[in-house]
Amino acid sequence: MTLLDLTNKTVLITGGAGAIGRVVVRALAEHGATVAVNDVMPEDEARVALAEAGAMAPRVSYFRADSTQPEMVDHLFDHVVHTVGLPNVVCCHAGMVESFPVNEYPVEKYDALMNLNLRASFVVAQAASRRWIANKVSGLLIFTTSWVQDVPWPEITPYNASKAAMRALMRGFARELAPHGIRANAIAPGIVAVGMAKRQWDTEPSYRARASKAIPLGQMQPPESVAHGFIFLCSDMAAYMTGAVLLMDGGCSLYPMD
């Protein structure tokens, strides 16, 4: 057994069938973890997506639920506990991003983003920590924030705000739950080569020029490097960390981009 061995970890990850989530799930399974993947997509679609990413391992299970809804989250935990046992690591990873100039950002889209990025993280973290306290489990919460918690990126202002708020949420859980042996940390990736950022990088020269300038290391972040951060935070190597943000952004937050 090594310090990065996760065979004693049962991990629930929300948003686990998404572009980054699938890579994280694969890495967790490769390091021996039992992984409960939560997302909103139908099970057959999720299984295909996970399989295409090489993440549909024997110790990986899928659980469909809307993580913004407390009743559904309670049912999710009941189902996970019945199937693989009570998770001792819960990753609040579900999230979304959309791009509009700040004065053109529709309020209904702002509400939807905050609902998923922030409310869901609170609902899931609260459900997990209540169960850990009841069962005297020293659990670990991991929140996915972003480098834009510190350096706002243009045209995604609500996303920037949601990630800054998520850092505060994480630190609140860490502060209040430490007496119960429960830890909370966050991971803050940079400009990852998936989803909207990758599409804009490939199709919009102005975005690529701006993003290239914002990344001191000069290239988009591979999702595998984000997964490496999750492995570290889940491992015994990070056992004395709580209330901390693991910033792995290629240097994006070192200075303003303009």
What are these model-derived regions, one by one?
Residues 101-102, 106-114, 211:
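Substrate-binding pocket helix/loop in short-chain dehydrogenase/reductase
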Residues 125, 162, 170:
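Active-site helix of classical SDR
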Residues 5-36:
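Canonical Rossmann dinucleotide-binding motif of NAD(H)/NADP(H)-dependent dehydrogenases/reductases
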Residues 9, 62, 86-87, 132-145, ...:
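Active-site loop of short-chain dehydrogenase/reductase
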Residues 130, 175-179, 239:
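Alpha-helical segment proximal to the catalytic Tyr-Lys
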Residues 105, 152-160, 172, 200, ...:
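Active-site loop-to-helix junction immediately N-terminal to the catalytic Tyr of the SDR YXXXK motif
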Residues 2, 151, 231, 242-258:
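Short C-terminal tail/terminal secondary-structure segment
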